[in-house]
Amino acid sequence: MDINLTLIVQMLVFAAFVLFTMKLVWPPLAKALEERQDKIADGLAAAERGRKELELAQHRVKDELKQAKAHSADIIDKANKRASEIIEAAKEAAKREAQIQAKLAQEQIAQQVNHAKEELRKQVAKLAITGAEKILMREVDAKANSELLDNLIEEI
């Protein structure tokens, strides 16, 4: 292989091409590669942030769900307690009403008994007066008076 002028010119052209490429072509390519690398890194970082935010959101949802369940259980317990209180109050009111009705019934019974006693007294007094009239109209006879009193006692 001979080293001649063509080989030297080709080396100079190649060196000029390398310089031209290093000065004008390589920096935009390197910049584009770096931008692409940054863009991919940003995308990966954003994906990681999104994954972490998703995990946090899932934890918050679980916590809020637990709180909602606890709150609903508390509301149900309060409602059951209130229902029990209402039932107890209704039972007490019914018991008081029953006592009042029983007392009124006893008072009515006592009034009816007193009325019956009064009527009985009136009838006894009437019978006594009638018996006394019969005794006075008849002759005074111990045996007859005794029989009249026995009859009077039987009527009473």
From Swiss-Prot:
Cysteines paired by S-S bonds: none
Subcellular location: Cell inner membrane
Membrane topology of the entry: Single-pass membrane protein
Main location class: membrane
Superkingdom of the organism of origin: Bacteria
The family this protein is said to belong to: Belongs to the ATPase B chain family.
UniProt xrefs under NCBIfam families: ATP_synt_b, PRK05759.1-2
Protein known as: ATP synthase subunit b
Native organism: Legionella pneumophila subsp. pneumophila (strain Philadelphia 1 / ATCC 33152 / DSM 7513)
Gene: atpF
